[in-house]
Amino acid sequence: CSSAGDSLIAVDPRSRELLEQYRPEGRVSELRASWTKLEDVLEHYALKANFSDLGLLPGGYFPGAKGLSGMIEFSEKSGSLALDAGRSGISLPAVFPEPEIAFDLLRARANWKVAGEVVDVKLERLQFEGADAAGTASGSYRYTGEGPGVIDLAASISRADGRAVWRYLPHAVGAEARDW
């Protein structure tokens, strides 16, 4: 028997802090996980799982999400993600002043590699449909341990509502351009 404050899985303090910060929710199936701890430090880890109706809060440059379904596989060195979701959403407060983006369809394939503080992410394909727009995208993101990182993105918009463009102009554009 355990109380509400007890943990069923032994995690290091940093992992516990991340769980409390992002508050993940949803269903997980076919979960396979392994880890190696040295004292209180998580040295090696690996996880593979299918998920449905996944949600988590945003934090810093990390996006939030709700209603996501798919598969994830990762370790401390690399990972891959496949999304196939109907009604869902992402939250990008570090990028957009109007951070909540709702989708009727969201499909994606991505992978990443980690070497020290350097993180390289490749978005193989993204397909999205929502009230404001529909289209596809692919690209890459590189984080070197400093600043927000560098993104190279190519997108094709098949349908867009011009009245909603202001919602998708990032903070970097400035309020004057959004209000124009």
Tell where the protein language model's regions lie, with residue ranges.
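Short, low-complexity, polybasic intrinsically disordered segments
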Residues: 64-71
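Short beta-strand segments at enzyme active-site cores
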Residues: 81
